[in-house]
């Protein structure tokens, strides 16, 4: 699978990932940042691209939650 095909698959999950993040954070800028990090995380997983659409969505949600949790723990440690 070439990079253009991988980018297309990631684009298919972009809005969904942002929606998940926004639902949990309720802040546009932080949601955008968390969604970007989550998509980069799943992009590093070669199995992601050969998984079913449902499997990909589950991985996107898990990555989004991980990124949000990580960002919040980083934020708490700064305070």
Tell me the role of every PLM-derived stretch.
Residues 1-7, 18-37, 50:
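Short, charged helix-capping/linker segments at alpha-helix termini
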